[in-house]
C-alpha cells in the first residue's frame, strides 16, 4: 500500500480553507512591535505621500521610484521576508499594517508597493530555490532592486493560462529563451527583476521565470500607459 501524500499549498490558502478563530486579529491585539511599525508607516505617509498625492496621479514615476527606495530604507519592503534573506521577518499582521496605511493614501504608490512586495517578492520567497532566494531576496527587500510580475498579455488577461509567450530551452541546455509580449505590467518602467510567465513546449500550465534586467537579455519596454497614475 502506497503512503498518501498531500501537496503543500503555498500562497492563497485563505481561498480554499476555513478561517479559524485564532487566525482572526483586531487592532486591540497588536503588540508593541506592531504598534511601532504602525506609527512609523503613518509618519512616512503623512510626510512623504499625502503632500505629493497629485504628483503621483499625474504619472510622476520618478517620485514613485524615489519613495519606494525610501520605503526600502525604512524596512517597509522587507517585512514579510525572513531575516536570513535580508528581511525583517515580522509576519502577516505587520505586513498588513504597512499595506493598509500605504494603500489608503494614493492608488499609484500603493499599486507599486503591492506589486513589489506581493507579486514581485512572494513568487521567489514561496517557490524559488535556495540559491535564488539568496541571490534576489536581499536586493528586493532593501529596495536596491524592484520587482515586476509579467503575466498579462494582449490576448490573455483573466484567463492567464492561455498566454502565448513561449520558453524554449537553449541548444546548450543552459537557459531558456523566452519570446512573447506582455502588457499592463506594474513597475516595469523601473524594475530590475521580472517574474515572466511563459509556456514550456506543450506544458498544460505556464511557468514563472526569474529574469533580471540586463543589457543582453532582449527586454524591450513600450510606452507607459496612462492609467490614473498607476
Which stretches of residues belong to each language-model region?
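Buried hydrophobic positions in well-ordered alpha/beta secondary-structure cores of metabolic enzymes
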Residues: 34, 45, 75, 82, ...
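A short, Trp-centered hydrophobic/proline-enriched beta-strand micro-motif
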Residues: 143-151
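Cytochrome P450 C-terminal beta-domain/meander region
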Residues: 70, 159-179
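Short, intrinsically disordered, charge-balanced linker/junction segments flanking boundaries
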Residues: 227-230
